[in-house]
Amino acid sequence: YEQRHFVSGLGCLEYMDIKGKRVPFGTDLLFVCEEEPELVAAAEICEDLWVTLPPSVLHAQAGANLIVNLSASNEMVGKDSYRRDLVSGQSARLVCAYVYANAGEGESTQDLVFGGQNMIAENGVILAEGKRFENGIVCSEIDVQRLNDERRRLTTYQPADDSDHLKVHFHLNVE
């Protein structure tokens, strides 16, 4: 349904000037934490998780161990369980943490209802999940070192060349 309003940004990597700063814009971005360089994040949006080859696969192969999904997945009977299985399964397949933030209260319309099913998964295990149709914060600790160690241990996990991805460095106050 997003194709009614958007076009694919796959393979698009440009720079834009926003408030006087040059900012990378595109789908192939890896966000590397300066204080914890083992933490590498990437993003996908909503239905990316539901397609046959989600962008998170390429992000993980390029080194991302934290995938964030900014979603607006509407509610239907049984969809919450299916969505949970997708998040859990993707984090298991990619040996990564997967943070899923769904549209919620105040974002529904007469056409669609959003329940705000927010989740954090690590290597196939749902670590935290918010209650649907309630506002709140979902948080959990993620063991990035364990994920990286598991990737090195597995012979089935195949990293790929990351030259298609631009690394954007960021600062995180770690206490």
Question: PLM features: what roles do these ranges have?
Answer:
Residues 1-175:
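Enzyme catalytic cores with a strong preference for nitrogen-chemistry domains
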